[in-house]
Amino acid sequence: NYVGGSIQKVNLNTGQFSTLYTECNDVSLKGPNDIVFDKNGDFWFTDLGKVRERNMDRGSIYWAKSDGSEIREVIQPFMTPNGIGLSPDQKTLYVAETEGGKLYSYKIIDEGQVEKLSFPISINGGKLLNNEGGIKRFDSLALEKNGNICVATLINGGISVISPSGDLVEFVKFDDPYITNICFGSQDLKTAYITASHEGLLLEVKWDREGLPLNFLNK
């Protein structure tokens, strides 16, 4: 039974779970989705919200400390926020919008703070980085070392590789229409691991460019 959203952590040695956050400013988390850690060990995450039969929540983007001491709602509202990532220099936050198939960027100006564009230039404060149009949806994302943003793309099934300036560098097509996630691994970070959700497969794909090392992981 659904009781709300939360951010939990697990002790890899014992397998024990503990809950860090269930709300922010007395507003319950609804459906935390994707997460990315910065170089300080704090993290940003998207909350897509709860989807019901005839309506859905307006989502949010949060920043929080990994010790459970502080959480901030940084961006709200944001319709269907999903994939989230940081630029190589940690100065730009990228957020993928699922339903519109759009990619937004935010300039990080301080700890847990972003610069927001005013309405009507932006409806959520972010810079619209890419909106290629057509029938598609964006899901999770990962970055290449050169700064390109690789976004898992639904409906037409593939990975949209978008430059920091917003240009579509390439579209890597797959047979599965529900490509939902991507991350980089292997010794040289030139192997992409991609989830094909319609067929329920995890794909291992050789990638032409090196993936961006994640903080505290690919070291």
Regions inferred by a protein language model and the residue ranges of each:
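A short loop-to-beta-strand structural motif that recurs across blades of beta-propeller domains
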Residues: G5-Q8, G59-Y62, K102-Y104, G158-S160, ...
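Short, solvent-exposed loop/turn segments at conserved positions within beta-propeller repeat blades
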Residues: N1-G5, G49-G59, T98-G101, L154-I155, ...
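Beta-propeller fold detector
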Residues: S18-T22, R72-Q76, V114-N130, E170-K173, ...
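Beta-rich, blade/repeat-based domains predominating
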Residues: N1, S6, N25-F43, S60, ...
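Blade-level signature of beta-propeller repeat domains, shared across WD40, Kelch, NHL, RCC1
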Residues: T180-K219
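Loop/turn-rich, solvent-exposed surfaces of beta-rich toroidal or solenoidal domains
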Residues: G101-K102, Y106-D110, F119-V169
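Flexible "stalk/tail and boundary" regions
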Residues: K9-Q16, Y62-R72, N146, N156-F171, ...
